[in-house]
A protein has these predicted regions:
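Short acidic/polar inter-strand loop motif in beta-rich domains
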Residues: 148-154
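Acidic/aromatic-lined carbohydrate-recognition and catalytic surfaces
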Residues: 37-108, 114-146, 159-426, 460-461
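Long, contiguous interaction/targeting segments characteristic
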Residues: 1-60
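Active-site neighborhood of glycoside hydrolase catalytic domains
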Residues: 381-402, 463-494
Length: 494
């Protein structure tokens, strides 16, 4: 095996695959080297590949603990511990911090632990020991392990159920039928030119009495408010958040309090505009966005004066939502505000890869300063996400109240747009030098290129799978079931 093949094996880049005719195909060294380059690994020649292998092995042996250990409930919880042979260590102490806040402590003699592997890095010998910890409850926990020499580290412990939850109607074997809809395509005489969350509630109210147990939806992921012509739900800006064009504007509580918004919507020219938006066979996304954002900005101004400045219960509900969503939502709202700001300066700014260099890093001082100086612009997009989340939550609540066996069935796209907020907020995870697709088959003899940057699986593990956890958590928050677009991507990705 040459160095490039060995390096590819270490980083999980396949050497072969089965084509659609069930014939084995080899992946060329050039393709393997290109994929490695996309994840930041130099494999241009044998010498570079050998150096990269050495670096990989050095990190593997010199790190005391892996970043994360995942087990299913009932399985032994075994943590590998890498210890230098020349280190005069006798004991280790461990402390588990449970997800709920309590802690548990223990200790072990190193000479009583099983040696599972031996190796070396930079002329120093190591042994990998197997530390078995007590069985833990479901959840995300943290273990701190310290040797008596002072060397210490942390590992995230993920204890997962053996399978996904099934509602009683499914687990009992009952057959459940439902409908699948593209929400944007729902028509009504009151919406503003595209299906919205009130239309979804109306669909639930009509379908539930007929025995419908599930309503399947297209991905509802956040797109780009400043570029409403970017319409594909399968190329979203951020899969953790929602497309705010689905907000039913007149159902927002602030609409009833905002005289300016009500007068504007009631105006003859605005009503004529809404009727025009409802008429075409295809959704006029640009027109819908213009109408909705015109009124939503008025509602935000009213919300600020009536609630944020008065610290009302509605203000507290908004603040709680923002706090719950945390840094991920703050960065998404910052991106939307920045994107809107820069697009006003010209078409050369079509997404973060085209932004001035300093703005491409979400932690850069210029970005932090922008978020501080344009705080209300950022807060406006936080507000929109809150409105969308509340209306989707109400739709699922309606499904439950009306006795649907399951309720809303959400959809998670396979990836995020290369110029959107999800990739901007975590550039180390997404590899812009490659794109996701599918191998050749009978319908696409040249294969498919979906134009979506893949995640680096090694970086995902380094980040303790937190991006995946956040993705599933946020998408399950307001639905009862979830479809992962291309579930095979949990195992492999073309």
């Amino acid at each position: 095996m040459n160095a490039v093949h060995e390096l590819a094996r270490l980083y999980g880049v396949a050497a072969t695959y089965m084509d659609y005719r069930a014939q084995p195909r080899e992946v060329s060294v050039q393709s393997q080297a290109a994929i490695l380059a996309a994840i930041g690994i130099d494999a241009a020649d044998e010498q570079a590949a050998a150096a990269a292998i050495h670096q990989h092995q050095t990190v593997r042996w010199t790190r005391l603990l892996p970043p994360v250990v995942v087990v299913e409930t009932g399985e032994p919880l075994v943590v590998p511990v890498s210890v230098p042979l020349d280190l005069d260590a006798t004991w280790l102490e461990w402390r588990i911090s449970f997800e709920g806040g309590r802690q548990r402590k223990g200790a072990a003699r190193l000479d009583k632990l099983k040696v599972v592997e031996e190796g070396s890095a930079d002329d120093r010998a190591y042994r990998r020991l197997s530390l078995t910890l007590p069985e833990l409850p479901l959840g995300y926990h943290t273990a701190t392990i310290a040797l008596d020499t002072g060397l210490s580290g942390e590992v995230r412990l993920v204890v997962a159920p053996a399978r996904c939850f099934e509602p009683p109607a499914i687990s009992s074997g009952t057959r459940v039928w439902g409908v699948a809809v593209q929400l944007y395509a729902l028509r009504s005489q009151r919406n503003w030119g595209m299906g919205d969350f009130r239309d979804l509630r109306e669909l639930i109210r009509e379908a539930a009495p007929l025995g419908c147990g599930i309503v399947g939806l297209n991905p509802l992921h956040a797109l780009m408010p400043a570029n409403p012509a970017h319409i594909s739900p399968y190329s979203p800006s951020n899969r953790q958040f929602l497309n705010v064009l689905y907000i039913a504007v007149e159902d927002v509580p602030d609409f009833a309090e905002c005289e300016a918004a009500r007068q504007r919507v009631a105006a003859a020219d605005f009503q004529e505009k809404l009727q025009t938006l409802r008429e075409p066979a295809n959704v006029d996304y640009v027109g819908v966005a213009a109408a909705k954002f015109e009124i939503l900005k008025l509602l935000y101004a009213s919300f600020r004066s009536r609630h944020l400045e008065q610290d009302t219960e509605r203000c507290q509900a908004f603040r709680s939502f923002v706090e719950m969503q945390g840094e991920a939502l703050r960065l998404h709202a910052t991106y939307d505000a920045l994107d809107a700001h820069l697009r006003l300066q010209g078409p050369q700014y079509w997404g973060w890869p085209s932004w001035p260099e300093d703005y491409r890093d979400p932690t850069a001082p210029v970005v932090v300063r922008f978020a501080r100086e344009r705080a209300q612009d950022v807060e406006y997009f936080l507000y929109l996400q809150w409105l969308a989340a509340e209306q989707l939550r109400e739709a699922q609540a309606s499904a439950r109240e009306l006795g649907m066996a399951v309720g809303l069935y959400g959809d998670v796209a396979v990836g995020a747009d290369s110029a959107g907020s999800e990739t901007w907020a975590n550039r180390r995870l997404y590899r812009q030098g490659a794109s996701v697709g599918a191998p050749p088959d009978a319908l696409a003899l040249k294969g498919q290129d979906w134009g979506i940057p893949p995640q680096d699986p090694n970086e995902l593990r380094t980040q303790q799978y937190q991006p995946f956890v956040g993705l599933i958590r946020n998408n399950m928050r307001y639905v009862a079931a979830l479809r992962l677009d291309h579930v095979m991507s949990l195992y492999r990705l073309w």
